[in-house]
Amino acid sequence: MIVTFVVEIALAIYTFARIKPSRVKNIILASLVLLALFQLAEFFVCGKYSSFTTDASSRIGFMAITFLPALGVTLANEISGRKNHWSSALVLLTATGFAVFFGFAPSAINNSICTGNYVIFALSEIATAVYSSYYFGLLFITLAIVFVMSRKQKSKVRRNSLHWLGIGTLSFLLPTGIVYWIIPSSELAIPSVMCGFAIIYAIILAFIIAPRTSSTK
């Protein structure tokens, strides 16, 4: 957890220092920082400092990862040239609603258990169903945008960047699906498992997509 946090923060610093300002850079930076924040939150959950720390860390972690699929949709729109597209505003607004729920609703997260390799977050059955639909729905929407818009792109840079965004999304979506298929009981740990695999996504964002879509300093 802490190693992944350090790597993702290092990638964020690298992107901030090396890539010239652009909307794509800002989205990638936000994604990297939020990924790192979730890893840090898991670290504090596993530290078992106090019930308050565990609850606060769980809430902060969930608020962080809630924005990731929305940023994925926004990044796909941005790379494909659909600046200020209505879908970007809609998914970010939806993400904000979920973040407020996880941050302030008393019963948003019932319990958080550290197993060593990952953290199990216990939500209510309804919250799990709604949140899973939101999260995986946006991931598949990102892949759909990548597929459709990459076929329309005349720019090789944009087309390749969209392809890499699709690869990056699948790099954590597919392994998580395989883990769940093999170990169905891992359902409550999916956020933790997914963000563990997402380090591959972070590397693709920092070293491939960011340099291709924005000039380096």
What are these regions (language model features)?
Residues M1-E8, I19-S107, E125-F140, L188-I203:
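Individual alpha-helical transmembrane segments in multi-pass integral membrane proteins
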Residues I13-K20, N77-S87, I145-H163, I209-K217:
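Juxtamembrane membrane-water interface segments of multi-pass membrane proteins
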Residues R158-K217:
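Interfacial "cap-and-anchor" motif at the non-cytosolic start of specific transmembrane alpha-helices
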Residues A144-I145, P175:
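Amphipathic, well-packed alpha-helical segments that form the structural scaffold of globular domains
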Residues V7-A10, L170:
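Glycine/proline-rich, flexible active-site/cofactor-binding loop segments
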Residues I113-A129:
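Juxtamembrane membrane-water interface segments that cap and precede transmembrane helices
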Residues A12-I13, F43, L75, L173, ...:
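Alpha-helical transmembrane segments of multipass membrane proteins
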